[in-house]
Design a protein with these regions (language model features):
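Substrate-binding pocket helix/loop in short-chain dehydrogenase/reductase
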Residues: 87-88, 92-97
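A short, exposed helix-loop element centered on a Lys and neighboring polar residues
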Residues: 111-112
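Conserved glycine-rich Rossmann-like NAD(P)H-binding loop of the short-chain dehydrogenase/reductase
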Residues: 29-44
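Residue(s) in the substrate-gating loop at a strand-loop-helix junction
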Residues: 131
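Conserved small/polar residues in nucleotide/adenosyl-binding loops
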Residues: 138-145
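N-terminal Rossmann NAD(P)H-binding glycine-rich loop of SDR-like oxidoreductase domains
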Residues: 15, 23
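The beta1-alpha1 cofactor-binding region of Rossmann-like NAD(H)/NADP(H)-dependent oxidoreductases
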Residues: 51-61, 93
Length: 146
């Protein structure tokens, strides 16, 4: 069993991209790292949990399990997300809703699950990672009307 002295980090979307790099960096820095993703792509030295961030009950259950095992979560890094390319008029509404569910409401679900324990322990950090496409004024999604 790992020492309770080591701090605990939780990373969403940790199976690829920035999330996977974040998982590796936190693990290297000495954190006990838990990783949420829908894909079953375990990373060595990391506790992978197959969790869909859009499923509030699943998120609550998984965070509860981490808190039972570790007692606290000091760092939450929300990296889960995906992008849709192309002009908005060609984007299916179902795709846009799925993107909001993961990118926004997924972040809300996990943050809401972790925040009460951070408040009780009077410490903790939440980092939300987003794509530059969210603020890029040249995005086709913003200038697609004629």
């Amino acid at each position: 069993m790992e020492s309770k002295q080591k701090r605990t980090a939780l990373v969403t979307g940790g199976s690829s991209g920035i999330g996977r790099c974040t998982v590796a960096a936190l693990s290297k820095a000495g954190y006990i790292v838990y990783e949420f993703s829908r894909r079953d792509v375990p990373v060595e030295g990391v506790k992978h949990m197959c969790v869909d961030v859009t499923d509030e009950a699943s998120v609550q259950e998984a965070v509860g399990q981490i808190l039972l095992e570790r007692g606290s979560i000091e760092i939450l890094v929300n990296c889960a997300g995906f992008g849709i390319s192309g002009a908005v008029e060609f984007t299916e509404l179902k795709q846009a809703k799925a993107q909001f569910d993961v990118n926004f409401f997924g972040t809300v679900n996990v943050s809401r699950a972790v925040l009460p324990s951070m408040r009780r322990q009077h410490r903790g950090h939440i980092v939300n990672i987003s794509s530059v496409a969210a603020v890029d004024r040249k995005s086709t999604r913003l200038n697609s009307s004629h």
